[in-house]
Amino acid sequence: MILSDKDIFDYVNSKRVLIEPFNSKFVGPCSYDVTLGSEFIKYKDDVYDLKKSLSHNKFEIENSIMICPLNHHLDETIIKNYKEKYNVNCVVSGGLLGTTNEYVELPNDVCAQYQGRSSFGRVFLQTHQTAGWIDSGFKGKITLEIVAYDKPVILYKNQRVGQLIFSKTLSPADTGYSDRECSKYAGQKSVMASLIKKDFEIDEEE
């Protein structure tokens, strides 16, 4: 059962669901809009070896970032020109991890799903790849996997990037996400790189 706008207000006001900060203007008919934070991660590895720690740079923007497609040629001169012409803080190409401003806490009988905005899809910008599902009992900010597929796209801090759709489960989970020992991203308050190397099935193969 998907929560309507009335349900979302009820769950937030009764503190069954925490969204911090909460903006009543961001409540849709059956969703809640979330906004882009200022912290990002860019991987440095030539190959993603998922049994090892992934090398990355974590950085913060003041206002805006230009995201270019993977094969878009960038050098120091082009980056400088883009920054001056479009007044952006940062220019990157390829995939990028970001995070929402919103910190969310779900009870054990509510799960959620993140969906990117349709307006972003219309400029071929995707803000999540496969990680749109949020288990019941989750606590933390939502990590975004951002890719531009056509032309460079400029994103701005605090703009709405997607929405959360909340669903009521038939019964509460015995153990919520943040209470499971194997949950790698419980309580995340910033953008986090992949921790897939911690997967138990990988360890068992050693």
UniProtKB/Swiss-Prot annotation:
One of its GO terms (molecular function) is dCTP deaminase activity. It holds the Pfam family DCD. Gene3D superfamilies: 2.70.40.10. The keyword Hydrolase applies. Its EC number is 3.5.4.30. The record marks G132, W133 as: Important for bifunctional activity. It comes from the Archaea. The active site is at E145. Keywords: Hydrolase, Nucleotide metabolism, Nucleotide-binding. SUPFAM superfamilies: dUTPase-like. CDD domains: trimeric_dUTPase (cd07557). DCTP binds at R117, S118, S119, F120, G121, R122, D135, T143, L144, E145, Q163, Y177, K184, Q188. Pathway: Pyrimidine metabolism; dUMP biosynthesis; dUMP from dCTP: step 1/1. The keyword Nucleotide-binding applies. It catalyses: dCTP + 2 H2O = dUMP + NH4(+) + diphosphate. One of its GO terms (biological process) is dUMP biosynthetic process. Homotrimer. NCBIfam families: dCTP_deam. Bifunctional enzyme that catalyzes both the deamination of dCTP to dUTP and the hydrolysis of dUTP to dUMP without releasing the toxic dUTP intermediate. Belongs to the dCTP deaminase family. HAMAP family: dCTP_deaminase (MF_00146). This is dCTP deaminase, dUMP-forming. It comes from Methanococcus maripaludis (strain C5 / ATCC BAA-1333). The lineage of its organism: Archaea, Methanobacteriati, Methanobacteriota, Methanomada group, Methanococci. The gene is dcd.
